[in-house]
Regions:
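Divalent-metal-activated hydrolytic enzyme cores
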Residues: 1-3, 38-45, 53-61, 73-160
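Short, conserved "active-site rim" segments that organize catalytic pockets and cofactor/ligand binding
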Residues: 1-48
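Short beta-strand segments
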Residues: 8-10, 34, 66-68, 141-144
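Short, surface-exposed, charge-dense and proline/glycine-enriched linear segments
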Residues: 19-31, 63-67, 92-102
Length: 160
């Protein structure tokens, strides 16, 4: 890649072409990791591992966490998700086993109320991660999925 950047963005399909255009990126410029809501919700989960791989193995020296307005994760209701799982053949026994194993399934499935708060929470988790090197700017942005306007909610250069 021409730029040593890794981006975590939401998996919303509206961002596939819009985000690179808004950031003036060409194909191959950056590493992109996607998750529902651009959420990093576990310090040792797959999303965090991908960001660390980008930094250590792929030499990224800047991280952007980019959510978007009108995100579907703001409306995710864990009870509706659990009902849908039951309707699609996941048994109550399996759900009980997952809950019993120490995972609060409702909390794990829960969306967020406010995109700004969610992005800032993810930025802080990544910034304070014990394996993230100091001096790596962790930026938080929100994109308007209709216009491509980017709003900076955390300038990582000011919080090194």
């Amino acid at each position: 890649p021409d730029k040593r950047i890794v981006i975590l963005s939401c998996m919303d399909t509206r961002l596939v072409e819009l985000l690179p255009k808004a950031m003036n990126l060409r194909n191959g410029d950056v590493k992109i990791v996607k998750s529902a809501g651009a959420i990093v919700n576990h310090p040792f989960g797959g999303i965090m591992r991908s960001l660390l791989v980008a930094v250590y193995a792929l030499k990224a020296d800047e991280v952007y966490i980019i959510g978007h307005y009108d995100c579907g994760m703001s409306a995710v209701d864990p009870d509706v998700m659990l009902d849908s799982m039951l309707e699609r053949g996941i048994t109550q026994e399996i759900i009980d086993i997952v809950n019993y194993s120490g995972t609060d399934l409702r909390e794990w499935l829960r969306g967020f109320g406010d995109v700004t708060t969610s992005i800032l929470k993810s930025v802080e988790l990544v910034r304070k991660h014990p394996l993230m090197p100091k001096g790596i700017p962790i930026h938080g942005l929100i994109i308007d999925p209709n216009t491509g306007r980017l709003d900076v909610v955390r300038d990582g250069n000011k919080h090194l």
